[in-house]
Amino acid sequence: MILKKRSKSSKNWLKRNFNDPYIKERNKKKLRSRSWFKLKEIDESEKIFKKGMNVIDLGSNPGGWSEYTLKKIGKSGKIFACDILPMRFLKDIVFFCGDISNSDFLKKIFLFLDKYSWNVVMSDISPNICGYSVIDNSNMFKLSNIVLKISRHVLSNNGYLIIKLFQGYGFNKYMKKIRNIFELVKIYKPNASRVNSREVFIIAYGCKK
């Protein structure tokens, strides 16, 4: 049997992940995802999560952000998680599987969300990446606009939005839009984000009603 040689890119991927301290720590702590550390950094910087908060986690699979948040808000809080892909069961979390860009599914989740007051909307959503930045960003901002629509609909006046974005095409336009909706807006790049990644996280506070 002749084994195919791994491509240079796959070798680089293996090397990068083998040497990644966050992946090592994730495995040690048995966490659901590497992105757990990104949210932890954001929270330690901004002091967002408190006991009893109600939180919406969009693009939740595999559950790293929900896992972190659950410990911060305690049993008196509530988490609604949503993803286009199924997510492994996580106790005390309400999970809906579906596509937020589908209008019928969006109506379905609003029926649930409207029953409660929400303190935080967080989104780690990312589109399928093709590698062409203009297309990737365009698809990203289509999803991000839906996240913004959900946030405006459900957030309390002193609520937070945490959302991942890609820098580059369309970024400044989206930032202008988000600054028109929230009182305070910050751009944050966690240490856990890879150096060559275009991702940044926006922390917005005080939704204008």
Curated annotation (Swiss-Prot):
UniProt catalytic activity: uridine(2552) in 23S rRNA + S-adenosyl-L-methionine = 2'-O-methyluridine(2552) in 23S rRNA + S-adenosyl-L-homocysteine + H(+)
Family label: Belongs to the class I-like SAM-binding methyltransferase superfamily. RNA methyltransferase RlmE family.
Entry binding sites for S-adenosyl-L-methionine: 63, 65, 83, 99, 124
Protein source organism: Buchnera aphidicola subsp. Cinara cedri (strain Cc)
InterPro entries: RNA_methyltr_RlmE, RNA_MeTrfase_FtsJ_dom, rRNA-MeTfrase_E, SAM-dependent_MTases_sf
A molecular function GO annotation: rRNA (uridine-2'-O-)-methyltransferase activity
One of the record's GO cellular component terms: cytoplasm
Keywords for this protein: Cytoplasm, Methyltransferase, rRNA processing, S-adenosyl-L-methionine, Transferase
Catalytic residues identified in the record: 164 (proton acceptor)
Protein name: Ribosomal RNA large subunit methyltransferase E
Entry EC number(s): 2.1.1.166
Function of the protein: Specifically methylates the uridine in position 2552 of 23S rRNA at the 2'-O position of the ribose in the fully assembled 50S ribosomal subunit.
Pfam entry (one): FtsJ
